[in-house]
From Swiss-Prot:
Keyword Lipid metabolism recorded: yes
Signal peptide residue numbers: none
Source species taxonomy: Bacteria, Pseudomonadati, Campylobacterota, Epsilonproteobacteria, Campylobacterales
Predominant cellular place of this UniProt entry's protein: cytoplasm
Protein name in the entry: Phosphate acyltransferase
Length: 329
């Protein structure tokens, strides 16, 4: 049975939503949940029926959101440090954390280590599209400054993820730019374009609107652009939801129409709801690391665990290393 390390203290709302998400996941999948945190707080939240699936690791500290990621290595008693160590030592196959993302990334990179030939790990996230499929975007925050070589490696990692985890047989990989023409972009993306042209999966430059139209399976960008893209998308989705709700309240006819379209709205919510995705994998490290939002609901935690299980059961890291080995200079 696969063991998953879970940072039980990492979220913004304490251990309750995280533990609820773990229990919801255990209703559907068998795995060993290794809960890292204050045992006095988390153990009472576990019903007796689930006790055989849960292991506890005591942690006396919580790495708060306000702390600097550079201090993570010093905080050896923190829940995130101990959870990462469980993966590093081979006691767990994956880690899920809704805590400090910078601390999670730095600890995963320094303690678990990078895959062979990977210069920099990248955070990948799934974006909804109009074709009822997902687009994988990376990097969305791990690296604000990238060289062309880094973007090229992201393309290989993203393509591997699309094949192994998303089950896309022949994924299309695009480079996010300010136009589709080969000449568009800055110096880094132009150089990356030349390097990515070696990949059979590469279709060239893509524009921002193609993230959501389903025409591309994997989109590559640096973490600065990717994080702005991610936060903007979250903001737009939230704003549209609020606009629809306010508009419905203003008219009885709109209210009736909304009731008739309840199923449509529910399907739309599922498409754009972050909770449906759960978390973002950190690609390029030796084991599975899933980074979840600090405000993760139980549903998001459950789906993050499902992501971790799918990753742990796959052969993706071997595939990434094999693909990168073909391009080592």
């Amino acid at each position: 049975m696969i063991s998953i390390a879970i940072d039980a203290m990492g979220g913004d709302f304490g251990p309750e939503p995280i533990i609820t998400g773990v229990l919801d996941a255990l209703k559907h999948r068998s795995f060993n949940a290794v809960l890292v945190g204050d045992i006095q707080k988390i153990k009472p939240l576990i019903p007796e029926d689930y006790a055989r699936f849960v292991t506890y690791i005591e942690s006396s500290e919580v790495f708060s959101m306000g702390e600097s990621a550079t201090d993570a290595l010093k905080r050896k008693e923190s829940s995130i440090f101990k959870a990462i160590e469980l993966v590093k030592n081979g006691e767990c196959k994956a880690i899920v954390s809704a805590g400090h993302s910078g601390a999670t990334m730095s600890l995963a990179t320094l303690r678990i280590g990078r895959l062979k030939n990977v210069a920099r790990p990248a955070i990948a996230t799934l974006m909804p599209t109009s074709l009822n499929k997902k687009t994988l975007v990376l990097d969305v925050g791990a690296n604000v400054d990238c060289k062309a070589e880094h973007l090229f490696q992201f393309a290989i990692m993203g393509e591997s993820y699309a094949k192994q985890i998303m089950r896309v047989k022949n994924p299309k990989v695009g480079l996010l730019s300010n136009g589709e023409e080969d000449c568009k972009g800055n110096e880094v993306t132009k150089e990356a374009f030349e390097m990515m042209s070696k990949l059979d999966s590469f279709i060239g430059n893509v524009e921002g609107n193609q993230i959501f139209d389903g025409s591309v399976d994997v989109i590559i960008c640096d973490g600065f652009v990717g994080n702005i893209l991610l936060k903007t998308s979250e903001g737009v989705a939230s704003a549209i939801s609020k606009i629809i709700k306010e508009s419905v309240k203003k008219s009885p006819f709109a209210t009736v129409g909304a009731l008739l379209m309840k199923r449509v709205f529910k399907a739309l919510k599922i498409q754009i709801d972050y909770d449906e995705y759960g978390g973002a994998p950190l690609l390029g490290v030796k084991d599975c690391v899933i980074i979840s939002h600090g405000k993760s609901s139980p549903k998001a935690v459950k789906n993050a665990i499902f992501q971790a299980l799918k990753f742990a059961e796959s052969d993706i890291n071997r595939v990434i290393e094999d693909e990168l080995s073909h391009f080592v200079r």
